[in-house]
Each structure stands twice: as structure tokens, then as C-alpha cells.
């Protein structure tokens, strides 16, 4: 498939033109014209680039790419090595950030709901969803379910929280700042990737369960599901590579 055609297909699927983002979405670095082997991953780190070379991939699709709004415009050290790897091997680098967080089927938030069997009821903010569990469960039962589905036990704050959880709000990645707005919807629990110092006090004083699973863990499934969709619909060769990241 032509590399610019692939960009157009994904932009249309993810409705990329509807979002104002802090990073360019789409084909960030042009490589070989014909896409034959795609690697997907969360972040375009050097380890993922090295894996792409190992598997003879000509294309990378990630959630966290390059050229962020507040990023230094100087190409030194780490960034120089990354770009050198991409350019010298004629690799296409694609990245979709917010469009891949919020897509109603493929997005990170939708994938969290799918994994945890949560019925989506609506959105609190564009990047924050809320829904209901199939059955009421204790906070510890919900934490154990998260561990089973994500292969990682979350940080769980539960002091002053209700015994049972049925109404849940969530936001992939760095969503801890939305906790107060989410609580206005009468939720029992809030799940996100990151946690801040003040989150402990906010969760306790608002009387909810708070679960932090890690930024990386909550944002693996969006780009993975995008790759699987490309494989099903266009018969492209796609593999997801998970570079370990505890954060």
C-alpha cells in the first residue's frame, strides 16, 4: 500500500481533522513509498525502532510520536539517534495521539471499557467516559479484575470509598486531573494511567475508589486495535510490539 494512502485511510477512520492536538497526527516522517511490513507500539522510542529493524519493518505506527508542541526544536543526542535510525533505514513513522484516545471503537478509552466489561453510558469530558459494571463488585474485586485483564495490579486508593463499585469513570494516560469533574457524575471509582501527589487526598475527601494502572498500560490497546483493524480490512502485515514500561 502507498504510504500516503495509508495515512489518508487512518485519518478518515480516526476522524483526525476533528481534533486540535499538541502533536501532529499522521505521517510524521516519510519513508519508503510502498508499505509492506508494519510494527505498532505505544511510543517511538529507540527500543521500538530497533525492534522494527530486527523484524525488517518499513513502517511504524505509534501513539506517542515526535514534534510535540513544547518540545525542543534542537535535534541533539537521543532525538538525533532516533531520527538517524528512521531516516537511514527509510522508515515511515506515523503517530496518532488524541484521535487514538477517543475513537469510539478503536480508542484507548473504548478498549479499557471492552477489557473490563463496562457498559459505556456517556462522556463526562471529550477524553473521559463513564459507565456501569455488569455486576456490583468490591474495590478489591475490581482491582483483581484489572490485574487479570491488564496483567498488572493497579495502585488502588480506597480510604473513605464505598464498599461496592458499579459506576465507573475512566481516562487513559494522564487523566488524574479530571477526577473532580468525574465525581460530579456520582461515580464510585475513577480509573486512569497516572497518579499525582494530590490525587490521594482528592479521592479520600470525595469518597471514591481511585485506580492508577500506568500511562503505558492504559494506552497499549488503542494502537494495537488499530493495527488489527488494518490487518483485517486491508490484509496488511502488522505486528504489535510491547516495549516494557512500568510508568
Curated annotation (Swiss-Prot):
GO molecular function, one term: metal ion binding
Pfam families linked: DUF34_NIF3
Top-level taxonomic group: Bacteria
Covalent S-S links between cysteines: none
Keyword Metal-binding listed: yes
Transmembrane segments: none
GO terms for cellular component: cytoplasm
Binding site for a divalent metal cation 2: 64, 215, 219
Residue sites binding a divalent metal cation 1 per the record: 63, 101, 219
Keywords: Metal-binding
Family designation: Belongs to the GTP cyclohydrolase I type 2/NIF3 family.
This protein's name: GTP cyclohydrolase 1 type 2 homolog
Upper classification of the organism: Bacteria, Pseudomonadati, Pseudomonadota, Gammaproteobacteria, Enterobacterales
